[in-house]
């Protein structure tokens, strides 16, 4: 029976953006990046859910300095802050990917990845990252898959990436595995059926190849099959599909998937007034329902590395002419259903670049862009304040890898 997890009275939450980066790993799909101020840093674009009207809370002031103490600079997250954890590092993509230590500004090249003019795509996997060269622009056939590209695995604690194979697309699997999908060079992935194979992170093939349903791409390999997403959006909403190659007729669909791991799927079905987040544990079959307050919804989330919690981005319509919303990060304990606000994260939707766990630890990392600065935050559950650093262009990489997909 479903286990109903109620948020409780009166907490404010709201709509969030939906991930699209699974599509970005194919040559046919343009990588959706937008410039944000300052210093032309990049982020992956995230389409928003339908607006929900609510009364906006007080505006959030902005800013910070990278040292522990009281934030003094205008335009950013304000208040008392903590020092950045000394050992916490994040990868940065680009022509030559690097490891970046926000606490010190140290930058070290990631070994095993040759220089790539088009840059690299990073996809979060258990214990590390799947890394693949960005496809760039295909001459003569913009919708074709093009030549296959090398796939690498970069461990959270690794100094170098290890080659895992060649493919047109890569997706995370159960721990220690990746799923590689290939197409004929002249095929259009939005209509063609890709051929997928499971490999170890060292590149050893683990089983037979499977032909995917035409027009679908693997988002996540799970303990109960492959979570598939449409390669491109089409007229009308197409649900994601949990597909078992051995029993394709038994597929289950999910409307509005917001996060997935090897053992859990979270989704937020379309709603009008009272929205819910559903979480299915694929190992036990247990389904939980997290109720959001009235007039709020959600469109993006991330499971913690150990699977014990789900962080959701909640947003509110503020009825402004530019369509911006107030957003806030909330952590849901999947054991108790308790919802905890991540402190100091009430900002405009335009300010939140991304969030996730760039290492297998309890530290949730988020990136924010304000008018005069970009801030990187770290939060450990139970802490009453954030650790914050200001990312200055002359001392930090341009494209940090924060969320599930980055390029």
Regions found by a protein language model. Name each.
Residues 51-74, 92-116, 138-166, 187-213, ...:
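Surface-exposed loop/turn elements that mediate protein-protein interactions on large endomembrane-trafficking
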Residues 31-60:
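C-terminal region of N-terminal signal peptides and the immediate post-cleavage residues
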Residues 299-330, 353-358, 366:
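Loop/turn-rich, solvent-exposed surfaces of beta-rich toroidal or solenoidal domains
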Residues 73-81, 114-126, 164-176, 211-224, ...:
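Repeated scaffold domains used in trafficking and secretory/extracellular systems
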Residues 16-37:
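Secretory targeting and sorting signals
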Residues 91, 132, 181, 228-230, ...:
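Residue-level marker for isolated small/hydroxyl-bearing positions within beta-strands
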Residues 88, 129-130, 177-178, 226-227, ...:
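Hydrophobic beta-strand positions that form the internal "hydrophobic ladder"
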Residues 1-16:
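Terminal targeting segments of Actinobacterial cell-envelope proteins
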């Amino acid at each position: 029976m479903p286990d109903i997890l109620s948020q409780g009275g009166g907490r404010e939450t709201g709509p969030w953006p939906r991930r699209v980066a699974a599509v970005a790993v194919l040559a046919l799909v343009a990588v959706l990046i937008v410039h944000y101020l300052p210093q032309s840093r990049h982020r992956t674009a995230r389409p928003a859910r339908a607006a929900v009207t609510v009364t906006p809370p007080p505006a959030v002031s902005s800013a910070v300095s990278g040292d522990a103490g009281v934030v003094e600079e205008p335009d950013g997250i304000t208040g008392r802050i903590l020092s950045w954890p000394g050992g916490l590092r994040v990868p940065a993509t680009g022509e030559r990917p690097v490891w970046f230590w926000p606490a010190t500004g140290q930058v070290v090249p990631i070994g095993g990845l040759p220089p790539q003019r088009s840059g690299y795509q990073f996809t979060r996997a258990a214990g590390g990252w799947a890394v693949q060269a960005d496809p760039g622009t295909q001459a003569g056939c913009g919708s074709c898959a093009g030549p296959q590209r090398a796939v690498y695995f970069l461990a959270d604690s690794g100094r170098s990436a290890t080659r895992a194979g060649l493919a047109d697309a890569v997706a995370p699997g159960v721990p220690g595995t990746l799923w590689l999908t290939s197409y004929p060079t002249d095929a259009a992935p939005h209509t063609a059926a890709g051929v997928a194979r499971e490999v170890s992170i060292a590149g050893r093939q683990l089983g037979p190849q499977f032909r995917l349903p035409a027009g679908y791409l693997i988002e996540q390999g799970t303990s109960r099959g492959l979570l598939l997403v449409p390669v491109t959006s089409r007229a009308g909403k197409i649900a994601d599909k949990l597909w078992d190659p051995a029993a394709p007729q038994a597929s289950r669909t999910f409307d509005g998937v917001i996060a997935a791991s090897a053992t859990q799927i979270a989704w937020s079905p379309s709603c009008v007034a009272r929205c819910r987040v559903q979480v299915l544990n694929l190992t036990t079959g247990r389904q939980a329902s997290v109720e959001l307050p009235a007039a709020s919804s959600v469109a993006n989330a991330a499971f913690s590395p150990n699977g014990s919690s789900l962080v959701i981005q909640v947003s509110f319509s503020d009825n402004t002419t530019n369509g911006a919303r107030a957003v806030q990060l909330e952590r849901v304990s999947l054991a108790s259903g308790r919802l905890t606000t991540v402190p100091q994260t009430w900002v405009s939707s335009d300010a939140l670049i991304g969030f996730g766990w760039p290492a297998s630890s309890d530290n949730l990392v988020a990136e924010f862009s304000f008018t005069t600065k970009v801030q990187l935050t770290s939060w450990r559950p139970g802490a009453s304040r954030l650790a914050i650093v200001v990312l200055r262009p002359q001392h930090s990489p341009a494209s940090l890898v924060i969320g599930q997909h980055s390029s």
